[in-house]
Amino acid sequence: FTINNVGISGNMRLDDEVIRRELYTRPGELYNQSLLFQTIRTLGSMGHFTAEAIAPDIQPVVNSDELVDINWPLEEIASDQFQIAGGWGGGTFVGSVGVTLNNLSIKNFFKKGAWRPYPMGQNQRLSISAQTNGTYYKAFAISFTDPWMGGRKPNSFTISAHYSDENNAYYAWQKGTRYFRTAGVAAGLGKRLDWPDPYFTFYAEASYERYML
């Protein structure tokens, strides 16, 4: 059989093009059962759909013995994360908060009506976190990842930055006289490999770290 049309339904937050670039079942190609299962695994690993509900609807084309249509009915799930935590360590309370947006769309930042609640659709990830004990320690981190840099090939781009500050003012009424600060940035590129299978990735990163005493 030859694949005639490939349809997608059920995606309200993720753009069609983002899903289609992950499909191994494409119009004009021969129907292949192994590529069908590979597509199911890939869609399930994206983290935006109910993996157990991914089941392609394969229908023969009317008046044809050689063509089939494949429709992918998808069930979206919440993929963003908000984390808040607290604990006791080193004789003090430590709190942390973080938010991760897993379906960001940078290209829609200035698009009218896109902020509902933020521009989404391109499967880009933005993560922001902060940690402090309220007195002598605080840390911040931010990272951004585009899994398909430029939208043409599955080459990922990641950029991140972090900052931490620790001093010897162990109580709120004290003034620190010594400190240890770190700041750093990093940028990395990832390339999806075909061998030994499409789930292997080569990743290279360059980073800069500064220590201040």
Q: Model regions: which residues?
A:
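N-terminal periplasmic "start-of-domain" segments of outer-membrane beta-barrel proteins
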Residues: 13-27
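Gram-negative/organellar outer-membrane beta-barrel architecture
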Residues: 13, 29-213
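Solvent-exposed, non-transmembrane alpha-helical starts
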Residues: 2-7, 153
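Generic structural signal for individual residues within well-ordered alpha-helical segments
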Residues: 7, 20, 37-40
